[in-house]
Amino acid sequence: GFESPGLTTIMKCFTFIGSTPSVVVISLFSLFFLYKVLKHRTELILFISIIVGSPILNELLKLLFHRARPDFHRLIEINGYSFPSGHAMSAFAVYGVLSFLLWRHIPTRWGRTLLIVISIIMILAIGISRIYLGVHYPSDVIGGYFASGCWLAIAIWFYQRYQEKKFEQRRPIQSKK
């Protein structure tokens, strides 16, 4: 069908970008940027909890489902269970949390749109690369997006509740008349 040497090279690049070593480098750079450049402190806790929690959740789900990887037309070899895709979960976690944290620092609609478009492209390209390379079924990737999306939403919800309580504690107490 769609297989070609050039496309295979591109898909291997996206798979590499979604691999653990790349996610670690992207995460370390992001932590430095959030801390040193944007002077974020509490956001680091959110970022770390999402980035650390996503692979833990992935491993738990793989142990729960025990789904074998596709055994036909693999372009790369990999071991372990298939569902959910760890690359899809990592991509959704990293680019999702970065979009959430960077959104408020981008003043223009064009800049925000670019942030979201780049994030969506990276998330989709990494997931599609796993299907193309024959190491995941489409449902593995979709399940990875869903699991990571749930984890991201829960973590952001707790973070926002924490921020609201912190803000309420800083407000001066209004005297009753």
Which residues are covered by each model-predicted region?
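Membrane-embedded catalytic cores of phosphoryl/pyrophosphoryl-handling enzymes
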Residues: 71-177
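Hydrophobic alpha-helical bundle signature of multipass membrane enzymes
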Residues: 1-81, 98, 104
